[in-house]
Amino acid sequence: MSYNDPNLNGQYYSNGDGTGDGNYPTYQVTQDQSAYDEYGQPIYTQNQLDDGYYDPNEQYVDGTQFPQGQDPSQDQGPYNNDASYYNQPPNMMNPSSQDGENFSDFSSYGPPSGTYPNDQYTPSQMSYPDQDGSSGASTPYGNGVVNGNGQYYDPNAIEMALPNDPYPAWTADPQSPLPIEQIEDIFIDLTNKFGFQRDSMRNMFDHFMTLLDSRSSRMSPEQALLSLHADYIGGDTANYKKWYFAAQLDMDDEIGFRNMKLGKLSRKARKAKKKNKKAMQEASPEDTEETLNQIEGDNSLEAADFRWKSKMNQLSPFEMVRQIALFLLCWGEANQVRFTPECLCFIYKCASDYLDSAQCQQRPDPLPEGDFLNRVITPLYRFIRSQVYEIVDGRYVKSEKDHNKVIGYDDVNQLFWYPEGIAKIVMEDGTRLIDLPAEERYLKLGEIPWDDVFFKTYKETRSWLHLVTNFNRIWIMHISVYWMYCAYNAPTFYTHNYQQLVDNQPLAAYKWATAALGGTVASLIQVAATLCEWSFVPRKWAGAQHLSRRFWFLCVIMGINLGPVIFVFAYDKDTVYSTAAHVVGAVMFFVAVATLVFFSVMPLGGLFTSYMKKSTRSYVASQTFTASFAPLHGLDRWMSYLVWVTVFAAKYAESYFFLILSLRDPIRILSTTSMRCTGEYWWGNKICKVQPKIVLGLMIATDFILFFLDTYLWYIVVNTVFSVGKSFYLGISILTPWRNIFTRLPKRIYSKILATTDMEIKYKPKVLISQIWNAIIISMYREHLLAIDHVQKLLYHQVPSEIEGKRTLRAPTFFVSQDDNNFETEFFPRDSEAERRISFFAQSLSTPIPEPLPVDNMPTFTVLTPHYAERILLSLREIIREDDQFSRVTLLEYLKQLHPVEWDCFVKDTKILAEETAAYENNEDEPEKEDALKSQIDDLPFYCIGFKSAAPEYTLRTRIWASLRSQTLYRTISGFMNYSRAIKLLYRVENPEIVQMFGGNADGLERELEKMARRKFKFLVSMQRLAKFKPHELENAEFLLRAYPDLQIAYLDEEPPLNEGEEPRIYSALIDGHCEILENGRRRPKFRVQLSGNPILGDGKSDNQNHALIFYRGEYIQLIDANQDNYLEECLKIRSVLAEFEELGIEQIHPYTPGLKYEDQSTNHPVAIVGAREYIFSENSGVLGDVAAGKEQTFGTLFARTLAQIGGKLHYGHPDFINATFMTTRGGVSKAQKGLHLNEDIYAGMNAVLRGGRIKHCEYYQCGKGRDLGFGTILNFTTKIGAGMGEQMLSREYYYLGTQLPIDRFLTFYYAHPGFHLNNLFIQLSLQMFMLTLVNLHALAHESILCVYDRDKPITDVLYPIGCYNFHPAIDWVRRYTLSIFIVFWIAFVPIVVQELIERGLWKATQRFFRHILSLSPMFEVFAGQIYSSALLSDIAVGGARYISTGRGFATSRIPFSILYSRFAGSAIYMGSRSMLMLLFGTVAHWQAPLLWFWASLSALIFAPFIFNPHQFAWEDFFLDYRDYIRWLSRGNNKYHRNSWIGYVRMSRSRVTGFKRKLVGDESEKSAGDASRAHRTNLIMAEIIPCAIYAAGCFIAFTFINAQTGVKTTDEDRVNSTLRIIICTLAPIVIDIGVLFFCMGLSCCSGPLLGMCCKKTGSVMAGIAHGIAVVVHIVFFIVMWVLEGFSFVRMLIGVVTCIQCQRLIFHCMTVLLLTREFKNDHANTAFWTGKWYSTGLGYMAWTQPTRELTAKVIELSEFAADFVLGHVILIFQLPVICIPKIDKFHSIMLFWLKPSRQIRPPIYSLKQARLRKRMVRRYCSLYFLVLIIFAGCIVGPAVASAHVPKDLGSGLTGTFHNLVQPRNVSNNDTGSQMSTYKSHYYTHTPSLKTWSTIK
């Protein structure tokens, strides 16, 4: 169609052809150029046609005509005019018939088939075994349409001749093995015999025929059927065959399970087996029968495989169809059982045995419809549901069982892996199913009590011990090497009487032997891994490894490593050299290295001898389903080795020289230093003396964590380098010097996009290229990416030729000038979307791309998109109204600022439409000249909201424009429907004879093109909630169907139960835009398949995909999310992308040739998944959107490029293409156990890898993808991913991959997936360990007199002053550590910078990097890392991982302080503030510049949520927010409030305590989730023990800093610092308890009475208690300062220690004393109001007060902490909000909007403005009052210290003696102050004979 066609005005509304992105009407300003239709095809006049453009008998070279046969291009291969398309047998009648029921999933067009005698088809050309791959099946051939002279007949005759059959490649071929009627009869017969549903049968018939048609279009029908049977049933890659042999069903069929004797073969049997094997290898097809007789009785896998292939080879086409049909019918109704592929195989096997039996064939009456579902599937479904949900009060409630108690899909499935499992299937009468004859088993399936059959086959226990087993090799490669490094560099530990002044060395044997203990460490790790495996894999399961032998082997190896080392230390006395010991030590070191290497390389599952050895069939199932890894070959394998050799070579070298050697001096000094301290009242100087050794222990532990971190650092660097190298190799980098990407673009379009080899009518390439290029440009114009003047410059135009009367095509100058870099303003708007898209298109075509097949040969594929509640189409209200009270901008305003050029194009377009419509309606010409000002005023509405008239067609345009620039389903559908346009375009361009055939009949041509597109491409949206949509959602869904009639929507339909008390009936239904609309406005479904019950048993998405999966069509599925986009130019590459599956052009081998070895063929590892790139279209919408986009780009592109090559890429959902047959027969496209499979997509990838599939990555194709844009939504996604990784750590997939992958693949898998998250965890862990080390180290430095240090002097020199402590090397370690953490952090930015550099050039990369730095994105990265690790820690400790829907909108609203604080306090702010206090102590105690980095990092943890909050620093909003914070703290105690401090505390606590099940129907119960109580052991490990270690570390530092080091005192002068901690920790708690008892008594006695006259009793009571708690805690802060003798440094460490001790107490109380939380908040309000009698708690009202009192004790301290911390955070923002115009600068930083495009401040009414100002004044006063009080608490004691007597507290005696720290005492006992000054040097010099004796 023309883009200046005035008849298109209303088309964007109904959009019947479904081809546009809303198909806006479009216009051309100038009329002198030739028009183009929607494919970019020039619309030619009849004259032009007569001039020969489309006459096959004439050829052109740029318009020059040649006589037939003399075209010089004929000899040039691709342009050669081969045999005519029409010279094919014309007499093939259409065999299909119409029987009143349309089996196709689309409505046929044209007259019914068989009506006309000439309704004929071109037969497929056989592509098997040796013919051309082209199929003409889809091209209509009408007798008499075109004759040899090129004459045309009546176009109507052509239309009548169109094929009406949806499966032409199969039905039109005379060699089809079975006619379609017979196939249909098979389906109907099976449906009757098994009781399948009729709709399911129709659906599966269409599914099967589409598969046959898809394959027949590129191979012969016979080969298509054979390959399909091989894929589903009998081929080496068929899952059914793999299962059949794994579960030894062949032996069941031969001798019966009951007669099987599995065990070792006798010697005689082994000899016979060897002989048979030789016979099979030498067998030829002729003597197959003889070989079969010879191997009879041989049960080996080879013999079984030979028998199988012989059997398959004898199958007739009828039997093949029947077998596939039966499998598909079982699969189509299997519901949740589709997630258990081997269970489904077992059901199919039983059904197949029954089908082949006489009992089935002779059965007179069919089984009732629904028998298969109700009798076979529903009992299994109900069992699976009962594991996750239980019935409480008549409704289904999620069970509280954790994963290790839930028998999930995988446990159910794995029962069927082994004959021993199948043998456990027992009837109610005790009969084993296997004891029945095979043909009787199917009818007995309904009698099995499944509850008694299934058991756990792997325990997903919530424990960190999974990491010990799964990643044992990682621990060995790090812990053992770290031990060896440290042992070698810590000689002082094993040197007798080491003295630094002499630097005496240890015996050589000791050095060797100590390092050799690394081998023992490795053995210990393996023993621990084996013991953990024992606890995770039940011995009951037949697939469990035999661990006893491995355990004893490991013990022996540990003994071999440990024994000689003990000998060395025992035999070799520490002062006497022994040659024997030296030799043993050295040998043992190399034995240890060998042990270390062996254990590092060998997978745990393959240690000593693999339990899956192929000589026995015992473990074939585990080999098949958990270890069929596709091997890497050639360059890929060497690259994989090279990557990891490089990583670990660099890592071990760098770690040794940088990390370990920086520890050498601190080890020497700290291990030999003993402190001269007075000590503590309770235990003297026992602890303070060894403070250096405690510090050393902490330093070694901290460095140990760093030792893990730098491996990940090197992985990032090496991966990036290799990825960059590959990008240069492929030619996708912008820096690649040898490409002229735009100059060569036309040629590349011709060679890489178009399949021109088989074209019948040959054209000059320019004619074909121009149509493709013009279509791309016009599609961009229609999407308002280009203005009309840009379009004119970019299009190919027809111009007069030099030959008179002829026309030729002129290429746009763009192709030449683009490479000259002078194109910025000439062809595109600068930095526009159009420029990006065309640049990528050009760049991608310069890479190697598989050759495309012709359109009619390409396979059929489906795009599948799950939809839940995402926006379909934005409403007008959402676009032009501010979305909430905190927003300052409407969505439309924001979009206009983000896309100014596109808005301008849209407005111009709309104005033209409005003017034309007005002219058409008024029927008169406009005045020629209007007043310019009036015209501008009239245009204002267009520029503001996009329309002037409120007519639906105008408002809809604006809605569509906004929806196409937001994350909506409409954007996704309009984008991916470009596949349809691309297929039509390619088909039209590559088959010009079709255009000729139709002549001027545009409608007939369009229908033919649509039919081809419909045949090759389906779009399926799984819209599970459609039946429950609200009216506006329904309206939007209906709009989609009208705009895109071929769109298919699968949804869940619900009907009330037939009988009362039963469950409602639920159906999977399918509709499209062709479905009839019923009276109620709904559409009549095409297919409606009943399910066993509600299919949503998991977290939603995977179940949603699974229920819709039965409606997919074709061979491949592309999985897409509802916030993606696609573009026409990318869709043109679809044929090449599908060719990546390596199934289109391969040499076909007969799959059932006997003698082909099982598992030895390269085809045994098909491509399961092809991943693709994503462009994050939200990348420039501010700093956070850009950070999220950058991460996605680097992960999805830069790393995926390398990972795919070295075998480490998995499936991440969108936008991957999957091999549908491979994946659907192996459990589907995702996994669905609730909680465990939270990140559902990645499990499908792991499943594919485990089962032998390959995963590739496609560089030249990319989709668009939206990402979260706000701080909260990005971190919600982060939390979901982190928690999901916690669940993955527990999963069996990680166990199989971790214990069975070869070392290089294992390392790739680990560092690409769990390693990233564990790295984040290690970073946070190292930060906390460092803080603990810093506190102790700086306490040591603060109390010591340090030596004058010169690093260049020998270590044996005497240090001055005499008696000093040389802690400089230890203090300098802080600098080295900081540098390490700094590098680890900044390395995260390397990939994104490199990615930007290679794709967009140096300038863009530098620009983006500095933009990120100036926008403080490093602070966000620090915070996000903490959220990752917090989510992971929390999930493994307490569970509760759940699906968090991610944000799809723009983050322009200011979020209240209270919401941000409550959301991030537990995960980051608390940890940051505790660490900040410790850092403050470290900074004050001993200043070092490197600590500035930690100040920045910890500031990020505390302040990041507020820095990235829009308009956080607007003055008025800030104080109104403060008002909201104060109200948040105080509300919720009188009556429930959704957003209150008490609600936040209760929800946080419930994650540990869990909720009670009792409900009283209160509103407060709605916000509570279903948290179950966490396991107490996990809580002790995760909460109490780390807290106790931290408290102990701080306490040791505190007692040391008070231990009076260097002070000349007596034992009587020892201070009582422990009592200070006890007082300041416990006194506030005791006072709080007293206050609570008083309040409780008062509320119980007078609360109900007061409540009658005072509505706020509860709030007042709570306010009093909370206020006292705040005051008490502040008072005891000052008390600690006083007790520490007004020393600020000592007070700081005292406060830190008190906080840690209180945390420990409260954790213990929560875990050990608190019972479950009620879902309602009645207990809380009753505590303050005294109204216990009306709570509805029943008898619990008697026990609840005690529980509530315990909780309130904790709450008062928490309230004080939140009050103080919240105010501190707000106070620190004061300097920022005082900066003039800070809000504008802050908005520029967040949104990257120029000042001219700034978001305006909101406009308020006078009343609102007055009210706001009054509130601001009031709360501003309160804010400054609190600020003054806080300042007073710090300034007061500091000033008072000068006026307080020096001997304060000296009068205290007894236990309280020295409670106050002495002030102004000298701690310098060095030099002349030493009591042993003169003899000091000599007394510390050892006698020579103590160290140098040599034997």
Curated annotation (Swiss-Prot):
Q: What is its EC number?
A: 2.4.1.34
Q: Which residues lie on this side of the membrane: Extracellular?
A: 1-473, 533-550, 604-1579, 1642-1758, 1843-1895
- Compositional bias (Polar residues) spans? 1-16, 25-34, 79-107, 115-141
Please list where the region (Disordered) is annotated: 1-143, 269-292
Catalytic class of the enzyme: transferase
Subcellular location, record wording? Membrane
- Covalent S-S links between cysteines: none
What main location does UniProt list?
Answer: membrane
Q: Where are the transmembrane segments?
A: 474-494, 512-532, 551-571, 583-603, 1580-1600, 1621-1641, 1759-1779, 1822-1842
Q: Which reaction does it catalyse?
A: [(1->3)-beta-D-glucosyl](n) + UDP-alpha-D-glucose = [(1->3)-beta-D-glucosyl](n+1) + UDP + H(+)
The record's Gene Ontology biological-process terms are: (1->3)-beta-D-glucan biosynthetic process; ascospore wall assembly; fungal-type cell wall polysaccharide biosynthetic process
Entry annotated with the keyword Phosphoprotein: yes
Bias (Basic residues) occurs at 269-278
Q: Does the keyword Phosphoprotein apply?
A: yes
- Biased amino acid composition, Low complexity: 65-78
Record topological domains on the Cytoplasmic side:
495-511, 572-582, 1601-1620, 1780-1821
- InterPro entries with a match to the protein in the record: FKS1-like_dom1, FKS1-like_dom2, Glyco_trans_48_dom
Subunit structure, as described in the record: Component of the 1,3-beta-glucan synthase (GS) complex, composed of two alternate catalytic subunits FKS1 or GSC2, and a regulatory subunit RHO1. Interacts with SMK1.
* Function description: Alternate catalytic subunit of the 1,3-beta-glucan synthase (GS) complex. Synthesizes 1,3-beta-glucan, a major structural component of the yeast cell wall. Required for spore wall assembly. Negative regulation of activity by SMK1 is important for spore wall deposition. Activity is positively regulated by RHO1.
Q: Anything else of interest in the record?
A: Deletion leads to caspofungin resistance.
Give the protein family.
Answer: Belongs to the glycosyltransferase 48 family.
The name of this protein is: 1,3-beta-glucan synthase component GSC2
Source organism of this protein record: Saccharomyces cerevisiae (strain ATCC 204508 / S288c)
